[in-house]
Amino acid sequence: MESGFLNIGFSSYISVSKIIGIVSPDSAPIRRMIRLAKEQGRLVDATFGRRTRAAILTEGGFIVLSAVLPDTLVSRLEEEEEEEERTEPITEQEAELEEESGEDV
């Protein structure tokens, strides 16, 4: 999960390595954080006019707004992580077993 990008909707992506948290914007403290970030020029609105459903907190102090639910974003992250695990290079031992059996490991 350290590299790559996360699709946050409408062909917009964010670097996975910069994400600190993904939260719902419904609570008063998060709404206050969003307002302050906007005042300070640290808000990125990627909702394309849709309802804000997730606020993504980043390392640099920026907040990125998304129209995609936090649960959906997290499941996309988990899918990406699982795919990375499946595409990891196989070990030498696994390659030998694959050659012997003629099947994929």
From Swiss-Prot:
InterPro entries: RemA-like. It holds the Pfam family RemA-like. Residues 78-105 have a biased composition (Acidic residues). Coiled coil: none annotated. Residues 76-105 are annotated as: Disordered. It comes from the Bacteria. HAMAP family: RemA. Belongs to the RemA family. This is Putative regulatory protein COPRO5265_1186.
